[in-house]
Amino acid sequence: MARVKAGSGARTTRGTAAHPPLADSGPVVAPAALRRSLGDTAEALFPLVLDAAALARREVDGPELLERFAAWGGDGVVVADTAGSAPGEERVGAWLAGHRDRDRFRLLGRFGGSPSAVASPRALVTRVEESLRRLGVERLDVLAVRPDGAGRLDQLLSAVEVLLARGLVGTAVASGFAAEELFEARVLAGHGHPRFAGVELPYSLLDSTRADGDLGLVAAGQGLSLLCTAPLAHGFLEGVERGRRQLGRLPDGVLAAAHVGRRGRRVLVALDAIGAELSATPAAVALAWLLSRPGVTAAAVAPRSPADVDAVVRAVSLELDAGHLAALERARR
């Protein structure tokens, strides 16, 4: 839990009932049946976590978005050490500091290798410390660590061990690892290094290459949870913007527009049909499909408004039957 300084994964119970009205007073805590375990740890998460990258945008009302997410029982926020992420971290920290039920929220931090953020052991510890200062909290509940590209996995895991020992991190998951690296990490864990509890990877109706391939097989064999990024294919599966030009205006427009074509259209048609039947948006149907996949603990979403939050959270209680799942499988192939 996010402690503020002074001064499948687990399967869920679903139903087709509409969301209840938001409470006017008192915190809303997701029922235990909705929260999913993270590997073999004591951590459990609401099936959707909020990507703080959305909060760094000027047009987004961060506190309002966070309040809406929390009102539906959401309890996980993802922060990262990417360029321009500091404003989002500061918004999250300020909101947590003033929240009446702040201790129920989990912070997931994504740190590691890119040309501007090399994941050397010392740099990893330093960047986590800097992030904690911006957030105004004492620890990250989950650390998603990326490889440094230099093959020094033992050193990287040693840095994770330091963070765990100092209480700056609760548990760790692998992010951006190849299947071979994940296997090596398990071997190193057998020699005393920290063991990963899960794997963070891109996973959606239109991108399941890693989850369906060797990485997914190794993760399943090790009992690791899947934490999914880009679950709506960078906005394409929201179904709001469908033309290449319109998609290009999204925050990840180039990546979203890459799905324009026959396959993308087939998937959107299937999402539209199922959504019309179940009174749900294409985004909710796409997320419900993902949350039904084996091993999935949570998906990171980046809504841009409270209405977007309402739409995506519908996925948590949406039940897709065998016919719906078969239609989506046909469309995405």
Which residues are covered by each model-predicted region?
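A short, structured active-site edge motif that brings together acidic residues
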Residues: 103-115, 199-203
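N-terminal binding-site loop/beta-alpha segment at the start of enzyme catalytic domains
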Residues: 2-106
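Beta/alpha (TIM)-barrel catalytic core signal, keyed to glycine-rich beta->alpha loops juxtaposed to Asp/Glu
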Residues: 3-17, 21-26, 30-32, 148-333
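Glycine-centered flexible beta-alpha turn that most often forms the glycine-rich phosphate-binding loop
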Residues: 50, 140, 172
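Active-site groove signature of glycoside hydrolases
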Residues: 132-152
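Active-site mouth loops of central-metabolism enzymes
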Residues: 51-63, 111-123, 146-148
